[in-house]
């Protein structure tokens, strides 16, 4: 979108806000926020939401980012490029909230089941009361599932809106033949949204869609980011998770292995930087901390690979067992006593092909009888 047009619209809002005031019934007036004030409040809400996400305070993050999303739409209009950040982080918070609700739904359900069992053993509970309790618990569980579905759906809608904004911006930049840096920046934003949509698909059980979104994100990242980027490693892990969730363990092993390769490349890169010497103490500390973090992370990745290899082997063993069982069943059937006609029919698949029915030999037609009589008369005359 045109930046100059945005600035012009902002100037109009500032004039309207400073020149007009709403009169209340008591005779007092209240001044509206200027665009600058709203933008400052928006930045504060975004910062607060991101801080809450970092410390895993999802409820607080969701509240701040929900308000930020609403405010950004009020300032710039819906689907404006400047609303992207609010939508992206709000979608992230809502997705985490949906995951939490899904976990909570499983936990209390198990607890209630145990409580009901204890209640069923107590003498002071009648069968009627137990039946009512089970009905109420079932209704509550259904309501919780609906809430979980609503949150999951909301997170998808928010992230999909952000994806559309990024895609439209990239298309506009390419049409304008803008600088490559701006196009790459928005491509990476698109990749970030696609990664979250991939996570959403995994959480929602839509593994094929998750794989497609993550694969698109990976292609963008590999074109823009260095091969040692940890963002690429993260996407590899998520694709591996999508494959594992869909029981494609051979592919899971491959993607987890690629994750390890990227992390090793990053380790090598950091070691070279430190060996060459880093004058900036803060930068050196960052490199050392990241290197330590990667070293601590590596055993977990190797364990994931080992688990995937084990799962792939189990699937292969199961396939072999099913095949052997089927072959054994076929052999048992072959050894069963059969009539001679049945044996011939079983070995002759030609009976499966439909043919026109033949007339019975012992039932000649009238024409055949007449013809036969004439032949006999001819023979007699000879």
UniProtKB/Swiss-Prot annotation:
<feature type="region of interest" description="Disordered">
    <location>
        <begin position="103"/>
        <end position="151"/>
    </location>
</feature>
<keyword id="KW-0539">Nucleus</keyword>
<dbReference type="Pfam" id="PF10516">
    <property type="entry name" value="SHNi-TPR"/>
</dbReference>
<comment type="function">
    <text>Promotes normal hermaphrodite (XX) development, in concert with zinc finger protein tra-4 and histone deacetylase hda-1, perhaps as components of a complex. May act redundantly with nasp-2. Involved in innate immune response to B.thuringiensis strain DB27 and S.aureus bacteria. May play a role in the uptake or spreading of dsRNA.</text>
</comment>
<feature type="compositionally biased region" description="Basic and acidic residues">
    <location>
        <begin position="10"/>
        <end position="25"/>
    </location>
</feature>
<dbReference type="GO" id="GO:0042393">
    <property type="term" value="F:histone binding"/>
</dbReference>
<keyword id="KW-0677">Repeat</keyword>
<feature type="region of interest" description="Disordered">
    <location>
        <begin position="1"/>
        <end position="39"/>
    </location>
</feature>
<comment type="subunit">
    <text>May interact with zinc finger protein tra-4 and histone deacetylase hda-1.</text>
</comment>
<feature type="compositionally biased region" description="Basic and acidic residues">
    <location>
        <begin position="369"/>
        <end position="382"/>
    </location>
</feature>
<dbReference type="GO" id="GO:0006335">
    <property type="term" value="P:DNA replication-dependent chromatin assembly"/>
</dbReference>
<dbReference type="GO" id="GO:0045087">
    <property type="term" value="P:innate immune response"/>
</dbReference>
<feature type="repeat" description="TPR 3">
    <location>
        <begin position="233"/>
        <end position="266"/>
    </location>
</feature>
<comment type="similarity">
    <text>Belongs to the NASP family.</text>
</comment>
<keyword id="KW-0802">TPR repeat</keyword>
<dbReference type="InterPro" id="IPR019544">
    <property type="entry name" value="Tetratricopeptide_SHNi-TPR_dom"/>
</dbReference>
<dbReference type="InterPro" id="IPR051730">
    <property type="entry name" value="NASP-like"/>
</dbReference>
<feature type="region of interest" description="Disordered">
    <location>
        <begin position="337"/>
        <end position="382"/>
    </location>
</feature>
<dbReference type="GO" id="GO:0005654">
    <property type="term" value="C:nucleoplasm"/>
</dbReference>
<feature type="compositionally biased region" description="Basic and acidic residues">
    <location>
        <begin position="103"/>
        <end position="112"/>
    </location>
</feature>
<feature type="repeat" description="TPR 2">
    <location>
        <begin position="191"/>
        <end position="224"/>
    </location>
</feature>
<feature type="coiled-coil region">
    <location>
        <begin position="264"/>
        <end position="304"/>
    </location>
</feature>
<feature type="compositionally biased region" description="Acidic residues">
    <location>
        <begin position="125"/>
        <end position="150"/>
    </location>
</feature>
<keyword id="KW-0391">Immunity</keyword>
<dbReference type="InterPro" id="IPR011990">
    <property type="entry name" value="TPR-like_helical_dom_sf"/>
</dbReference>
<dbReference type="GO" id="GO:0050830">
    <property type="term" value="P:defense response to Gram-positive bacterium"/>
</dbReference>
<feature type="repeat" description="TPR 1">
    <location>
        <begin position="42"/>
        <end position="75"/>
    </location>
</feature>
<keyword id="KW-0399">Innate immunity</keyword>
<dbReference type="InterPro" id="IPR019734">
    <property type="entry name" value="TPR_rpt"/>
</dbReference>
<dbReference type="GO" id="GO:0034080">
    <property type="term" value="P:CENP-A containing chromatin assembly"/>
</dbReference>
<dbReference type="GO" id="GO:0042826">
    <property type="term" value="F:histone deacetylase binding"/>
</dbReference>
<keyword id="KW-0175">Coiled coil</keyword>
<protein>
    <recommendedName>
        <fullName>Protein NASP homolog 1</fullName>
    </recommendedName>
</protein>
């Amino acid at each position: 979108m045109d930046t100059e047009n945005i600035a012009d619209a902002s100037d109009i809002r500032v004039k309207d806000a400073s020149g007009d005031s709403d009169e209340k019934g008591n005779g007092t007036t209240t001044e509206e926020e200027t665009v600058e004030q709203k933008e400052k409040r928006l930045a504060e809400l975004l910062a607060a939401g991101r801080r809450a996400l970092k410390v895993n305070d999802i409820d607080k993050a969701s509240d701040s980012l929900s308000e930020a999303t609403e405010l950004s739409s009020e300032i710039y209009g819906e689907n404006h490029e400047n609303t992207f950040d609010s939508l992206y982080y709000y979608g992230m918070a809502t997705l985490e909230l949906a995951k939490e609700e899904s976990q909570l739904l499983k936990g209390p359900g198990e607890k209630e089941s145990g409580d009901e069992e204890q209640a069923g053993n107590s003498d002071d509970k009648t069968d009627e009361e137990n039946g009512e309790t089970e009905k109420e618990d079932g209704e509550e569980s259904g309501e919780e599932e609906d809430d979980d579905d609503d949150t999951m759906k909301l997170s998808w809608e928010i992230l999909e809106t952000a994806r559309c904004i990024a895609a439209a911006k990239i298309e506009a930049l390419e049409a304008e033949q803008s600088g490559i840096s701006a196009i790459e920046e928005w491509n990476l934003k698109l990749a970030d949204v696609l990664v979250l949509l991939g996570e959403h698909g995994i959480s929602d059980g839509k593994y094929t869609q998750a794989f497609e979104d993550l694969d698109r994100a990976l292609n963008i990242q590999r074109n823009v980011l260095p091969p040692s980027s940890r963002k690429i490693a993260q996407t590899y892990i998520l694709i591996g998770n999508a494959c594992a969730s869909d029981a494609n363990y051979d592919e899971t092993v491959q993607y987890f292995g690629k994750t390890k390769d990227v992390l090793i490349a990053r380790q090598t890169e950091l070691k070279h930087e430190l060996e060459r010497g880093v004058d900036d103490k803060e930068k050196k500390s960052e490199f050392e901390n990241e290197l330590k973090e990667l070293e601590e992370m590596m055993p977990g990745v190797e364990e994931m690979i080992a688990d995937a290899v084990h799962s792939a082997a189990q699937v292969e063993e199961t396939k072999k067992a099913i095949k052997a069982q089927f072959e054994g069943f076929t052999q048992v059937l072959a050894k069963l006593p059969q009539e001679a006609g049945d044996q011939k029919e079983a070995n002759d698949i030609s009976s499966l092909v439909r043919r026109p029915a033949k007339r019975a030999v012992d039932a000649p037609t009238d024409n055949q009888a007449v013809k036969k009589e004439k032949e006999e008369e001819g023979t007699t005359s000879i």
